[in-house]
């Protein structure tokens, strides 16, 4: 059975070209570090992944690379005095995934575009990089495309990612309500 070029690209990215890939990535990541945090790019870095998620090389489809700081969910230490255990600094995890944060930042930077999808690109010692696929719903080439009708239809609300109207975000919020709210209600109030 014949395999597509995209399957070979994915295989090279995952397994075969690891040594070559590391040498290339070192140079690329040095350039990316010097660039701004949110940059529009001409074409996706991982073409096979972008095509799987709905990217097409046509007018109205934009790819943006987003750079995020790696590390835990850092919270500011309170100024007023209390014992260290009650500072609320350590052991806190963010409610959002890295990918969701990247999508939200890209959506804020480009308010006239809608987020289609996103994917991880690379990591280095300091940063984590994602590419976000955005589409312009006002263009007729996008409006008439059946692939994008679920995002650009009349009934679909605008700026879904900022308002947490995507399925992934709704599921996360529902899960947190199911798990955290009962615990908070059961906990004895300290008075």
From Swiss-Prot:
Coiled-coil annotation: which residues?
Answer: none
User: By its UniProt entry, which InterPro entries does this protein fall under?
Assistant: Rbsml_eL15_core_dom_sf (IPR024794), Ribosomal_eL15 (IPR000439), Ribosomal_eL15_arc (IPR020926), Ribosomal_eL15_CS (IPR020925), Ribosomal_uL23/eL15/eS24_sf (IPR012678)
- Offer a single GO CC term for the protein: cytosolic large ribosomal subunit
What's one GO BP annotation on this UniProt entry?
cytoplasmic translation
Q: Where is the signal peptide?
A: none
Q: Which UniProt keywords apply?
A: Ribonucleoprotein, Ribosomal protein
Q: Which GO terms describe its molecular function?
A: RNA binding; structural constituent of ribosome
Record family assignment: Belongs to the eukaryotic ribosomal protein eL15 family.
This one is known as: Large ribosomal subunit protein eL15
Q: Which gene encodes it?
A: rpl15e
């Amino acid at each position: 059975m014949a395999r597509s070029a995209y399957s070979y690209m994915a295989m090279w990215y995952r397994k075969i070209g690891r040594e070559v890939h590391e040498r290339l990535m070192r140079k690329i990541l040095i350039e990316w570090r010097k660039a701004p945090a949110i940059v529009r790019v001409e074409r996706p870095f991982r073409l096979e992944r972008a095509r799987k998620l709905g990217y097409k090389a046509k007018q109205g489809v934009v790819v943006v690379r987003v750079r995020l700081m790696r590390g835990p969910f850092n919270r500011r230490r309170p100024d007023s005095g209390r014992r260290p255990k009650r500072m609320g600094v350590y052991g806190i995890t963010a409610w959002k995934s890295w990918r969701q944060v990247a999508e939200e930042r890209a959506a804020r930077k480009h308010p006239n575009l809608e987020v289609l999808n996103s994917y991880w690109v690379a990591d280095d010692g300091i940063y984590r990089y994602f590419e976000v696929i955005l589409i312009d719903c006002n263009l007729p080439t996008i409006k008439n495309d059946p692939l994008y009708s679920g995002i650009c239809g009349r009934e679909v609300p605008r700026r879904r990612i900022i308002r947490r109207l995507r399925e992934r975000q709704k599921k996360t919020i529902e899960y947190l309500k199911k798990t955290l709210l009962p615990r908070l209600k059961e906990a004895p109030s300290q008075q």
